[in-house]
Amino acid sequence: NKIEPLFEGVDFVFHLAAESRIQPAIENPTQSVEINVGGTCNVLQASRLKGVKRVMYSSTSAAYGLKNKPPLREDMIKDCLNPYSISKTAGEELCKMYTDLFGLETITFRYFNVYGERQPLKGQYAPVIGLFMKQKENGELMTVVGDGLQTRDFTHVKDVVRANIAATKCTSGFGEIFNIGTGKQISVIDLVGLLGGEYVHIPERLGECRFTEADITKARTILKWEPKVTLVDWLKE
């Protein structure tokens, strides 16, 4: 009830709010589920009651886990390794249900390792690019988790924004999931090489994917969206 007035007269809702880190979710699963599942249900219900046209929901590539091999497609099985990915994929199901049952148009995005301006730069669980940049700036060793051979599909925040805007203009794909990535993977150790500097290995962490790379065919086809920012070009800037 508290959030319903905020949805009055709104056409599009971009739902990005979440408890959004894997390791803190492992430490406090109840909080992660309550915030991410309950919060998403609140957003969808308020949108339905106030006549919102469409909800864009931000989910995670962590849904693919370890059982699926890149490139990762939206029709692959879910393999949730931690409470965070469980809570976010539950939100995906809620979005589909609100589309099927109530006719609320929803679009779900699975983001692949978003980076860019205003990214968190400190803390044990800050995204790796921001963390490495801050460590290097401070003259510290960059902390590589495990052997560093794990790969990620790093996606610039501007491309994420463009995907959300594109979703306000599409005419199909409601209740469905769309990967938002670049379709290219880079290892953490190669990222260190791009940044330059000394590093140290730290122990592996539980509940994290090994390799990620998005198949973005569906977003290209239905949303008419393409990634424009490459990691190499952004680092040069």
Language-model region placement:
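Catalytic Tyr-X3-Lys loop
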Residues: 14, 18-19, 26-37, 41, ...
